Amino acid sequence: MASSSLSNLMLAIHEKKTSSVDLYRPLRNYVTFTYSEREAQLIDDDLETLKQLRSDIERVSDPSPAARRDLLISYYKVLCLVETRFPISPDKDHVNAVSFVWYDAFKQKHKATQQNIHLEKAAVLFNLGASYSQIGLGHDRTTVDGRRQASHAFMAAAGAFAHLRDNESIKATIGPSTTVDVSVECVGMLERLMVAQAQECVFENTIAKGSTPGVSAKIARQVGIFYEEALSALIISPLKDHFDKGWISHVQLKAALFYGEACFRYGKELHEKEEIAEEIARLRSGASRLAEAKKSSRGAPAQLIEAMNTLESSINGNLDRAVKENDRVYLMRVPSPSSLSPLPAFSMVKPMNMTDILDASKEKMFSILVPDSSAKALSRYTEMVDDVIRTQAERLQQASELTRVRLKEMDLPDSILAVDGNSALPVDLKEDVEAVQISGGPAGLEAELQQLRDLKRVNQELLVHTEELLQKEATEDSQFRSQFGTRWTRPQSSTLTKNLQDRLNRFAANLKQAGESDVKIERSVRDNSALMSILDRRPIESAVPTLARPIMSLDATEDAIVGTLKQSLRQLENLGAQRAGLEDMLKEMKRKDDILPKLMTITGSYEDMFRKEISKYDHICEDISQNIEVQEQLLMQIQAQNEEFSTIFNLEDYKASKEKCYKQIQAAIMKYREIKENINEGLKFYVTLQDAITNVKQQCSDFVMTRSIQCRDMIEDVQRQMSGLSFQDHRSSGPYPSVHQPTASSPPPPPETQNPSHPHPHAPYYRPPEQMSRPGYSIPPYGPPPPYHTPHGQAPQPYPPQAQQQPHPSWQQGSYYDPQGQQPRPPYPGQSPYQPPHQGGGYYRQ
C-alpha cells in the first residue's frame, strides 16, 4: 500500500465555540473589595491583558493554527494564575458575576454554562489539542520532513487531550450543565485517535525508506491497535450517539486497514523464512478482516475504500501464490486463525508531556495578589516542612557517617574482598600507578634511553661535520698562502674562526659530560629494574597480597563465616541506598508541596490544614527511623562476625604484608619519576644542543662560502700582479698596498680579538649548549694582517680610498668576530645540569 494513497485521509478536530464574557470588571471589583483600590490599580494592566486574550479567543483574528496554538497556550497559563487568586463560583464572597459558556465541538446545539474556571480551562485545552491536530493535518506528508513534523504535531495534540483528561475533565463536568466533548471518555478517545495518526505518519516514513517487511508489519500493527482503542470508545455510550457515522466508519476502516497491512507485510517476512503455513493463515486473517470492515463502510470516503480494495487485492494475490506453493512443495498444515499468536507490534510514538509547555510558574501576572494571611500562613507552613526535612536529613547523614567510621575501624569491606583476590589499593596510590602506566611504565624506559643515544649520535655527527667545514677551509687557505707568499695578504682562517672553534670545543665538552650523565641514568635503570618491575603489573591490584585461607581447619567453617559476613555487608549497603532514596523522597515531596491555592481559598482554621498537610511526611519519617534501627542491629552483628573472621584468617599478618606492598609500590613510583625526569632533562638538552650546533654550522657554511668567493677574487688579482698587467693608478688608489708600499694602518680588531686571553667561565659539569644569533659575515680587504693589539684609546686608521676595486658585497654584512658584550644570551642556563649526588638532584637538573 503506497503511503500517497492515504495522504489526505486523516482527521482534524474543530475548535469549541464560546460566548463573550467580561472578566475585567468582576475581577477588578473583587480585588478592590478584598484588597484595596491600590492593588486594583496595580493589576489593571494585567486585567487588560486578560481581557484582550479572552477577546482573541472568542474571535478567530488569525486563522493560522500555529498562531491559535500560541494564543491558547498563553491564555491557559493566565487562567492558571487567575485560578489561584480569584475564586470564581456562585459563592457570594467569590467572583460570582462570571459565567463561562462553551458549545460542544461535535454537537454545536449543546452548550455548557458554569461559574467554574475549570470549564474555561478544559475548553482551552480542548481547543489546543484541536489546533495541534490542524497543524498536523496541514503538513505536506509527501516528504520525509513533512511526515515527521505531522507526527510530532499529532503527538502534541494527543498530549493536550491527555492533559485535559487527567487534570480538568472531571472538574469541568460537575453539575447539570456539561458537554460530552470534554468528558473523560471523549478526550480519551481523541487522544488515542491522535496517537494513531502520529504512528501512521511513522509507518508512511517506514515504507518510504524501504524498511524490512518485519519492521513495517510491527509499526502497522501498532497503528491498527491505536485505531482499535479509539473505536472501542466510539461504539459505546456516551460517544456512540454523539459522533457522525462518518467518524465511526473512518476509524473502523482505518483499524481494519492497518490490521490487513500488518498481516500483508508479516506474510512477506514469513514467506522469506519459508513458513508458508503461517503465511497463509495470516493472509486469510487479514483478508477476512478487510472484507468484514467493508460491509460497514457506508459514509466512508471513496479514497479510503479504494485503498482497502488495493490492499485486499495484494493480500489475495500473495495468498493464492502461497497456497499453490504449499500444495505443490511444502504440504504444510495451515493453522486456524484463532490459534495464531497476536501479531507483533512496536510503538514509535506517545502523547507529548504538556507540563512544561503549560507551566505558568514563570508568569508574572497578578504576582502582587497574595493575601497577607495566606502569605503568613504559607511562610509558617514552609518553616514546619523545612524543620521536618532538616531533622530527618541530619539523622540520615549521621547514620551514613556512623556506618563509614565503623566499617573503616573493622577494615571492611577491603579485608573480605581480599579473600577473593580482589585487593584494592588506596585511591591516591592507584591514581599514581595509573599515571605511571599511561606514561609507558618501567618497560618503556628502554625506548626513551634509545632516544637519548640517537640524539647524542646526531649531535656528535653534526659537530664533526661542522669542524670538517672549518678544517677544509683552513687547509685551502694555508696552501694558497704557501703558494703566493707575501702577496696572500688576507687574514688567516685560524684568526677569523677562533670564536667559532671555541664554541665547537665547548659543545664537544658538553657532549662528553652528557654522555657521562647518560651512563648514570642507564646504570640507575638497571640497578632499580627489579624495584620498578612491580609497576608493570596489570592490574596493579594483582601485586597486592591476597588474604590466604587458613592452612589447617578443624571444622572447615571459614567459607560459612565469609559468606555470612558478605551477606551482612550487602544488607548494610542496601540500607544505605534506601536512605538515599528516602532523602530524595523528602526533597521531592517538598518540591511538589504547594498549598498556596488552598491557603488562598480556605475559610476555616489554618492549624487543622497544617496538621493534615504535614502528616503526609509521617510515613517517610517512620521509614527513616526503621532504617536507622535496623542498621544499628546489623552493625553489631557485623562486628561480631568480623571478630571471628579476623581470628580465623590471621588478619593482622595480612595487614602488615599489605602495608609493606604499598610502601614498595610507593618507592618504585618515586624512583621511576626520578629516572623519568632525568631522561626528560636529557632529551630536552640534546634537542637544544642540536639547535645550537645547527646554528653554528650555518655560520660556518656562510663563512666558508664567503671565503671561497674572496679567494677566487684574490687569486685573480695576485695573478695579474705577477704577470705585470697591473696599473700604477690602480695600485695607488686600490685597496691593497704593494710590496714596496708601507702598509696602511689596519682597523682595530673586534674586542674579542684584542683580548684573546679573555677568560671563559669554568665549564660546568654538564654545560648546556650555547646559542647565538647569526651575524652577517664581512671579510676585511686583503692586505697585511691587522694588528691584533691596538693600544687602548687609539683610534683605528681607515683603509686608504679604493677607487677601482670594490669589496665583495657579502663582505659588508658584519664581522666574523663575535665582539664581547654583543652576543645574545644563550637559550639555556650556564649552570651545571647535574647536582652532586648528596644534593639529591636529577642528572639533568639545572
From Swiss-Prot:
Where, if anywhere, are coiled coils annotated? Answer: 565-592
- Amino acid composition bias (Low complexity), ranges on this chain: 763-780, 790-823
Name the segments for region: Disordered.
Answer: 726-846
Q: Where is the BRO1 domain?
A: 5-403
Gene3D superfamilies (alphabetical): alix/aip1 in complex with the ypdl late domain, alix/aip1 like domains
Q: Without the gene, what phenotype results?
A: Seedlings lethality. Severe vacuole biogenesis defects.
Instruction: Indicate the principal place this protein occupies in or around the cell.
Output: cytoplasm
The GO terms describing molecular function are:
ubiquitin binding
**Mind listing the GO biological process terms from this record?**
endosome to plasma membrane protein transport; multivesicular body organization; protein transport to vacuole involved in ubiquitin-dependent protein catabolic process via the multivesicular body sorting pathway; vacuole organization
This entry carries the following GO cellular component terms, namely:
cytoplasm; cytosol; late endosome; multivesicular body; plasmodesma
Look up keyword Coiled coil and say if it applies. Answer: yes
Quote the function comment for this protein.
Answer: Class E VPS protein involved in concentration and sorting of cargo proteins of the multivesicular body (MVB) for incorporation into intralumenal vesicles. Fusion between endosomes and the vacuole will then target the cargo proteins to the vacuolar lumen. Associates with FREE1 and ELC to perform function in the ESCRT-I complex. Binds ubiquitin in vitro. Plays a role in the biogenesis of vacuole and multivesicular bodies (MVBs). Required for the endosomal location of AMSH3. Mediates high-affinity phosphate transporter trafficking to maintain phosphate homeostasis.
Its recorded name reads Vacuolar-sorting protein BRO1
Lineage, broadest ranks: Eukaryota, Viridiplantae, Streptophyta, Embryophyta, Tracheophyta
Q: Which gene encodes it?
A: BRO1
